[in-house]
Amino acid sequence: MPDLLASYVAGNWYTAPDEGAVVLDAATGDAVARVSTTDLDTRAMVDHARRVGGPALRRLTFQERAAALRELATALDANKAAYHELSLATGATRRDSTGDIDGGIGTTFVFSSRAKRELPDGYLLADGDVEPIGKGGAFVGQHVYTSLPGVALQVNAFNFPVWGMLEKLAPAVLAGVPTIVKPATQTAYLTAAVMRDIIASGALPEGAVQFVCGGAGDLLDHLGGEDVIAFTGSASTAAVLRGNAAVTTRAARFNAETDSLNCSILGPDAVAGTPEFDLYVKEIVREITTKAGQRCTCIRRALVPASVVDDVIAGVSARLDKVVVGNPRNDTVTMGALVSLHQRNEVRNAVAALQRAAKVVYGDPTSVELVDADAEHGAFMAPVLLLCADNERSEPNEVEAFGPVTTLIPYSAPDDVGVLAARGRGSLVGSIVSYDPDFVGAMVSSAAPHHGRLLILDRDCAAESTGHGTPMPQLVHGGPGRAGGGEELGGMRAVRHFMQRTALQGSPAVIARLVGGS
């Protein structure tokens, strides 16, 4: 029987008294770990964060917190080879894991470096300029940010067990707010391995971070207006959390990043044979095969001119023919497994729902050729490309198949594209692939209000582009509407989400003394 993963509670590792739930290897079906939070004292966790972790972090200046983050990232970087080995059990290939593991550690380094450059060596963060209020200049105002005295609870998704934790932890540490990490059960064993190294590093003060390995229990019952809930996952779970009394009655801050029917738009100028057409086809294939399509930023709707639909299908199909699906431990494999058999069933059901409006033009959602694996025990699925010839159908704008699946949707006139993009009702990211500046300008104007991020991809930037689906720590990640209405990352913007903005009023000398010593 595999080990029962421990939670880190009030300075001690806690192992539940029962057998817990078994977590399986996504590729082989073998048991990897067990998880349980039976009898976990969640009140003690929140109290410890507020009374021990928070004060300890707030005794550090912004610069000292930045140094602690660098020490932490350095320690994790030294151990990342072990994380990569463990990550294979999640179904991810080694290349997939780079985005999660190296990306998470790299994000921590970026936050440390940006903080060293941009934040003061103090405890108070000025926001904007001094505002003259009195006629004689003796009375002024100044907005400032200070650390929230509560706790940040992060509830994370299964697809990024390392990056998902670190990209939330880093800005919270800089803000001086302690964190409780609650990973998704399916991949909690990888988060747990990283968490043990975080604690062992000693880079953060005691109480700055705690860990719940299993269900959250009644943790939200102890949160209120001084606290932050940072969630990544499904829209349905976000709705449940958003409706909790911690948010609705006690006004805890709630930030959500949820499902997203992201689109990629091919411009009318990007016909077969142009660099932009080739870039578009390559991007589609990369998006639906990276992490087996299990990224919240994955392209779900491919909006293409009706005149090039057949060319796009041919181009995507030719590239997908080269994809090797199977056990990620085999170096010839280029696409691994979905996270679980349950997740594969969910994706197949979603594809069936999409097939009410679309037809499969590549792949078979129920059958796949595998290397070093079998589809009975491993959660494997072939890449699937669908075509929804009638762009008035609602299904592609409502159903997300969270796997290696995307749907082609044709458009006849450029004026239609903005309307089609908006039907996703809010997305994390969209991309525009075109070399026509007029088309790009029109698309940005119409699509930007519905997206948290827009990639404009063409031959001039392709060599350095980080791609449609990769959030960068310097840029905001999140989106309106269906995408959750939240925002994270974006450099030092992320730090302010864990702080309180207050307007100070007083004499210029007092305000200057307060802010100047920040």
Give the positions of each predicted feature.
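Short, well-ordered beta-strand elements within core beta-sheets of diverse protein domains
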Residues: 19, 31-38, 54-58, 132-133, ...
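Short loop/edge segments at beta-strand edges and connector loops
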Residues: 213, 362-364, 458
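Hydrophobic packing residues within well-ordered alpha-helices of enzyme cores
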Residues: 87, 108, 191-194, 222-223, ...
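N-terminal Rossmann-like NAD(P)+-binding subdomain of aldehyde/semialdehyde dehydrogenases
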Residues: 1-137, 322, 339
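Conserved C-terminal structural/oligomerization subdomain of aldehyde/semialdehyde dehydrogenase
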Residues: 27-34, 63, 67, 203-206, ...
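Rossmann-like NAD(P) dinucleotide-binding subdomain of oxidoreductase/dehydrogenase enzymes
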Residues: 119-279, 411, 464
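ALDH superfamily catalytic-core signature
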Residues: 75, 197-202, 226-228, 237-391, ...
